[in-house]
Curated annotation (Swiss-Prot):
Pfam families: SAM_decarbox. This is S-adenosylmethionine decarboxylase proenzyme 4. Disruption phenotype: Reduction in the length of stem internodes. Increased thickness of veins in leaves and inflorescence stems. Altered morphology of xylem vessel elements. Altered homeostasis of polyamines. Hyposensitivity to auxin and hypersensitivity to cytokinin. The double mutants of bud2-1 and samdc1-1 are embryonic lethal. The gene is SAMDC4. Coiled coil: none annotated.
Length: 347
């Protein structure tokens, strides 16, 4: 293991709002009306920038120098890796939303366990300190609050940290969010995310498209429009846009601290979309990692134990990954989180 390297594990923040004149009729664009200059100022505080972007009728998707930002009419998702100061975005985003007549309804902050925890700035050296900073940034109206550290017995160093706050005890979000964290990537597969000789002639967008094709990422969801970006000399990010559904992948391929993440939002009961277990199988197969963790957040959807078991069966059958730990916790106003840890059967 390297003494120091780039921190791949992301910090993730999700803010959900409601319109003071609900339903949203006067301002159907909602948060999407925030001008780019204002967003750029927020990202400057976080210590990252926009490197590529795409939009459709439902939302705006930005690839950042450190991960991704998604802006929906009443929801913002921002995840950043490295040593970024993600929590500095909370207050300015709430302020920008208030100027549009939107009031904060719920907040969720989550992250895995850092590979290089000592390299993180305050408050990210302690989850307890992070929770304090988040709580101080939120209005008192978000009174249903909970912090939890979900620690798998097979690998305590890969805990999942979650803090939620909501104005309502029942969740308003009928979307399931799946977050996959992968470490110790297959070395051959990881080579796809290094720029090759001659790539200096291409820009980062075209090099990113080549990485998308060579790695097989374009096969994970054939219906998605992919906005991708290749970093120099290595590393990769992409956002996928499919109707009102997003997906995102980030890769730190260096040996010794290799890491990749895959995230998507979906409905379990939408017949127009694929079985999540098959999607996860294809995403994980791109990287062939030695360690996989999957955090699934059931918002307004009821927790579905059969989906959890199906994911375990498919990953065992197709990728020879065995589920070593399965944890579950409930968060008022934010739903149920299931955290699964996998390693190859040979381990």
């Amino acid at each position: 293991m390297a003494v120091s390297g780039f921190e791949g594990f992301e910090k993730r923040l999700e803010l959900r709002f409601f319109d003071d004149d609900k339903p949203i009729t006067k301002n159907p664009m909602g948060l999407r009306l925030i001008d780019f200059e204002s967003l750029d100022q927020v990202l400057n505080e976080v210590q990252c920038t926009v490197v590529s972007a795409v939009a459709n009728r439902s939302f705006d998707a930005y690839v950042l120098s450190e991960s991704s930002l998604f802006v929906y009419p009443t929801k913002i998702i921002i995840k950043t890796c490295g040593t970024t100061q993600l929590l500095k975005s909370i207050r300015p985003l709430i302020h920008l939303a208030r100027n549009l007549g939107l009031t904060l309804r719920a907040c969720r902050y989550s992250r895995g366990s850092f590979i290089f925890p000592k390299a993180q700035p305050f408050p990210y050296t302690s989850f307890k300190d992070e929770v304090i900073v988040v709580e101080e940034s939120l209005p008192k109206s978000l009174c249903y609050r909970k912090a939890s550290v979900m620690t798998p017995s097979n690998n305590p160093s890969r805990a999942w940290h979650v803090f939620t706050a909501s104005a309502d005890v029942e969740s308003d979000e009928h979307v399931v969010v799946v977050e996959v964290c992968m470490t110790e990537l297959d070395r051959v597969n990881a080579r796809s995310f290094f720029k090759r000789k001659g790539d200096e002639k291409n820009n980062s967008d075209s090099a990113g498209k080549e990485m998308t094709r060579l790695s097989g990422i374009d096969n994970i969801n054939a219906n998605a429009y992919i906005c991708d970006f290749a970093f120099d000399p290595c590393g990769y990010s992409m956002n996928g846009v499919d109707g009102d559904r997003y997906s995102t992948i980030h890769v730190t391929p260096e040996d010794g601290f290799s890491y990749a993440s895959f995230e998507c939002g979906l409905s379990l009961y939408d017949n127009g979309h694929e079985d999540i277990s098959e999607v996860l199988s294809r995403a994980i197969d791109v990287f062939r990692p030695s360690d996989v963790s999957i955090a699934t957040t059931y918002g307004g959807e009821d927790y579905n134990h059969e989906v959890t078991k199906r994911v375990e069966r498919v990953l065992a059958k197709k990728l020879d990954l065995k589920c070593r730990s399965r944890l579950m916790d409930e968060f008022p106003g934010s739903g149920t989180v299931v955290y699964q840890s996998f390693t190859p059967r040979r381990k």
